[in-house]
Amino acid sequence: MEQVNKSTFSDVLEYVRMSRRQNKLKREIADNEKKIRDNQKRVLLLDNLSDYIKPGMSIDEVQAIIANMRTDYEERVDDHIIKNAELSKERKDLSAKLKAMSSSK
């Protein structure tokens, strides 16, 4: 009987742990989506900025700086998209495990 109680208690603790992780993943996904939007806006800003640069402003240097900044922001967007996909997959796996645990009781 004591073994059954330990097993049940352990299952409950595992269920709570996975539920908390699932909620944390939801928050991280939302945070990543915000970062993606922010960096996409920065890319657009830099595109617009390059339209306003006038020829009298050492154009080659300014364009090189803008190109470097744009590349950096695009890489950040890509990194956040990849991280978001990984988090979504983990969240999906946890949802399936939680569903299986709750239906087996």
Swiss-Prot record:
It is found in: Cytoplasm. InterPro entries: DUF496, UPF0265. The keyword Transcription regulation does not apply. Pfam families: DUF496 (PF04363). Its main location: cytoplasm. It comes from the Bacteria. The keyword Secreted does not apply. Residues 15-42, 70-104 form a coiled coil. One of its GO terms (cellular component) is cytosol. Keywords: Coiled coil, Cytoplasm. HAMAP family: Pole_loc_TmaR. Belongs to the pole-localizer TmaR family. Pole-localizer protein involved in the regulation of several cellular processes. This is Pole-localizer protein TmaR. The gene is tmaR.
